[in-house]
C-alpha cells in the first residue's frame, strides 16, 4: 500500500528552532509527506518565516485553543495522509530516513500504532544528553506509568481520528492520549 505521512507541528515563538524542524522535515527522503503547522501569534518572526514556506507544508493560524492539545487535534483533522505523527517545533529528525523507515514498518508489520527512539540534545544541539530507547510494548507497563513519548508515535489516521488528545488535561493530555490509543 502506498503510504502518505502527515506530520503535525504546533508553534508559538518557535524561532530559531522551527527552522531546524522544517529543514529536517524537508530533508526526509520519503516523498509522499506533508507538514501541517498550526501557529499562534508570535513575537519572534515565526509568522514571517511561515509565510515563506511552500510545497508540502500547510500553515494554519491557531483559533485560540486552551492548550497545545487543541491545535494538535486541529492539525490531525487537517491531515490527508494515512499515517499521522507529531513533530514539535523545537524537535527535528536525526537523519533523512526517519519517514521512510516509518512507512516501511507500517507496510511490513501491519500495525496501527508505531513508536521509536528519541534523542534529547543540548540547546546547541551538538551533544546528546539523554536517550529514550523504545522497547517491545507491554500493556501492563502503562499502568505503572511507562509510556512512549507522544512525539515518537505514528498512528494510522483512521485510528488517531478516533483517539484525539483531550483538551481537559492541559498537562497530561499526551498521557491520556496514549492510554486511550493503546487500550483499544
Where are these regions (language model features)?
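N-proximal low-complexity "stem/linker" segments adjacent to membrane-targeting elements
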Residues: 1-24
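Short, acidic, metal-binding catalytic loop of nucleotide-sugar glycosyltransferases
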Residues: 23-32
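A conserved acidic beta->alpha catalytic loop
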Residues: 39-48, 88
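Glycine-rich, basic loop-to-helix element that forms the pyrophosphate-binding segment
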Residues: 62-79
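Conserved donor NDP-sugar-binding/catalytic core segment of glycosyltransferases
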Residues: 96-128
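Conserved nucleotide-sugar donor-binding catalytic segment
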Residues: 130-184
Amino acid at each position: 500500500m502506498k503510504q502518505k505521512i502527515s506530520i503535525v507541528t504546533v508553534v508559538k515563538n518557535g524561532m530559531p528552532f522551527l527552522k531546524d524542524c522544517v529543514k529536517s522535515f524537508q530533508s526526509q527522503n520519503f516523498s509522499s509527506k506533508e507538514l501541517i503547522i498550526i501557529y499562534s501569534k508570535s513575537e519572534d518572526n515565526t509568522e514571517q518565516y511561515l509565510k515563506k514556506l511552500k510545497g508540502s507544508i500547510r500553515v494554519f493560524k491557531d483559533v485560540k485553543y486552551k492548550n497545545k492539545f487543541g491545535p494538535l487535534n486541529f492539525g490531525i483533522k487537517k491531515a490527508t495522509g494515512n499515517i499521522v505523527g507529531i513533530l514539535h517545533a523545537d524537535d527535528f529528525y536525526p537523519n533523512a530516513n526517519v519517514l521512510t523507515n516509518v512507512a516501511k514498518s507500517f507496510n511490513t508489520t501491519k500495525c496501527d500504532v508505531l513508536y521509536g527512539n528519541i534523542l534529547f540534545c543540548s540547546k546547541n544541539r551538538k551533544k546528546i544528553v539523554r536517550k529514550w530507547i523504545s522497547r517491545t510494548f507491554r500493556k501492563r507497563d502503562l499502568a505503572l506509568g511507562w509510556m512512549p513519548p507522544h512525539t515518537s508515535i505514528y498512528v494510522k489516521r483512521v485510528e488517531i481520528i478516533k483517539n484525539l488528545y483531550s483538551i481537559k488535561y492541559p498537562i497530561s493530555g499526551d498521557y491520556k492520549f496514549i492510554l486511550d490509543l493503546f487500550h483499544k
